[in-house]
Amino acid sequence: MEIRTTSHFDKNLAKKIKKNSRLKNKIKNQISILQNNLHHPSLKLHKLKGKRIDEYSFWIEDNLRITCLFVDDVILFTDIITHDEY
């Protein structure tokens, strides 16, 4: 599956990495797993509710998640937030 990102995601990602440079490798690893196996247990992939009902979320570390949409053969990353923020 192809990965695409929103400008909102890109801005938030840059901020998170600037605060914590070790995140870059963790994020790359989880994205690689996502592309190869959506059902891998380390992702903790799940559908969201409420305002983000059309989105999914997967785990990066601790309380950090990436939210995304699945559109045809594209995974669109929409945000990188803590669990409390969604």
Language-model features: locations:
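A short, surface-exposed loop/turn module that caps and links secondary-structure elements
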Residues: 33-58
